[in-house]
């Protein structure tokens, strides 16, 4: 049986501060809305803008980070999957449905003052964090020396192979 693909990638602005709760087992969960906008031309050729609102849910450590750093208006990149859940409405007895994006990766974008937090920070629910290895110090020799430090050599035009 062939596997399907359920992947969502969005860049938008938070419509509200994340609402943090805990499950009965103590696991963190946050919910927030994300607005994405796109431009299009109407039948008259006028430029219009359409905004789509998305329900986002994050769990565990990612939920804790979202509740701590994200604020209304903050621009973020969200990666996740679509999930539809259903429940019975206690008042009407009707079956209700909600489609939301289960967030597995989040990156804060934009300036610091656009909703708080640190710019360009990220967290992924699925992937381990890796840090860039430190750059080794140059060993003896003048590999990275600047011309002013005597590392460059003068060549005669006749010595060059081209």
Swiss-Prot record:
Residue ranges of every copy of the SSB domain listed in the record: 5-110
InterPro entries assigned to the protein according to its UniProt record, in alphabetical order: NA-bd_OB-fold, Primosome_PriB/ssb, ssDNA-bd
Bias-annotated ranges (Polar residues): 141-151
GO biological process: DNA replication
Keywords, comma-separated and alphabetical: DNA-binding
GO cellular component: nucleoid
Name of this protein: Single-stranded DNA-binding protein 1
Organism field: Chlorobaculum tepidum (strain ATCC 49652 / DSM 12025 / NBRC 103806 / TLS) (Chlorobium tepidum)
Gene of this entry: ssb1
